[in-house]
């Protein structure tokens, strides 16, 4: 049988990851086409039922803020994954996006050193993919 890990809100954690992506993409006030593509590509890879998909499409129309996303983590591992999902959704080229990632890391209680490691990993993956 399939056991899906749960977020702190009792929903499947994979939904929390997409909510983090949506929230980060909206940090500058709108979800751009590249950000939307990343989010939809991620949703397409998940094995979601119709209710879960509807939940996520509602989340796109009413994105959560960093505080709401911070409340979804059960422990440091999930917190790190939520931060990384948010970071994957955006290219933080706007001060509001950078501020969002900082606020999210603080709310999730992800240590600065771990954030730096995750950021380095992201940059290495982007370099390898280029």
Segments (PLM) and residue ranges:
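Small-residue-enriched hydrophobic alpha-helices in membranes
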Residues: 1-22, 34-130
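Acidic, glycine-anchored loop motifs typical of Ca2+
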Residues: 29
């Amino acid at each position: 049988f399939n056991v899906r890990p749960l977020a702190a809100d009792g929903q499947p954690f994979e939904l929390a990851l997409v909510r983090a992506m949506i929230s980060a993409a909206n940090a500058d006030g709108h979800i751009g086409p590249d950000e939307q593509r990343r989010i939809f590509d991620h949703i397409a890879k998940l094995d979601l039922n119709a209710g879960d998909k509807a939940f996520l499409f509602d989340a796109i129309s009413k994105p959560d803020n960093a505080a709401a996303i911070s409340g979804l983590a059960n422990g440091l591992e999930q917190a790190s994954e939520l931060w990384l999902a948010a970071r994957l959704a955006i290219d933080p080229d706007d001060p509001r996006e950078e501020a969002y990632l900082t606020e999210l890391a603080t709310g999730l209680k992800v240590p600065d050193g771990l954030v730096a490691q995750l950021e380095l990993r992201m940059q290495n993956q982007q370099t390898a993919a280029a």
